[in-house]
């Protein structure tokens, strides 16, 4: 998805947010306040790394992050997870595999109080504008290659137009 808050732009003229070597947190569950992600934010600051949050954040954590970015405490960007429902979960799982993250999901029993740095992934670069976000990952794991092959096999058997499009989009996302 696209950059949510202009305060996160690193290039205001081009309306871009570029993060080099960001840590990446992903969630399908709402993050109600900044305390719930405080441990991973502190980890990013101590590690001198930027942070990309692909998560539905409520207004309090968004405001707190914008203030901390404005003060120069952390380089951060927040984008909404792409798509909806099961498609959202599929796409986030694919992205997580690509960047080495764990998707936070309360519906699967994850505790909002147990968001830790070991859930974070990383990319070489993340660039967001008003139209979307591109993650640059130079090294693709064997698991990513296996997922691409699995999706291609599934696609070859699929005849429903909506599912064909969804599978094609997922293959494109993982293939870069």
Language model regions located:
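Long, structured protein-protein interaction/assembly regions in large complexes
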Residues: 1-176
């Amino acid at each position: 998805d696209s950059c949510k808050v202009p305060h996160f732009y690193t290039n205001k003229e081009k309306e871009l947010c570029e993060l080099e070597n960001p840590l990446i947190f992903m969630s399908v569950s709402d993050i109600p306040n900044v305390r719930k992600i405080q441990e991973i934010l502190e980890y990013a600051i101590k590690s001198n790394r930027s942070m990309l949050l692909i998560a539905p954040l409520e207004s309090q954590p968004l405001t707190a992050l914008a203030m901390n970015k404005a003060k120069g405490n952390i380089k951060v960007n927040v984008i909404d997870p792409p798509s909806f429902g099961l498609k959202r979960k599929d796409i986030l799982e694919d992205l997580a595999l690509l960047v080495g993250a764990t998707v936070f999901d309360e519906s699967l029993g994850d505790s909002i109080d147990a968001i830790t740095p070991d859930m974070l992934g990383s990319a070489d670069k993340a660039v967001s504008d008003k139209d979307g976000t591109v993650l640059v990952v130079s090294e693709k794991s064997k698991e990513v290659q296996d997922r691409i092959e699995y999706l291609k096999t599934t696609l070859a058997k699929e005849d429903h137009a909506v599912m064909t499009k969804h599978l094609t989009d997922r293959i494109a996302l993982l293939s870069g």
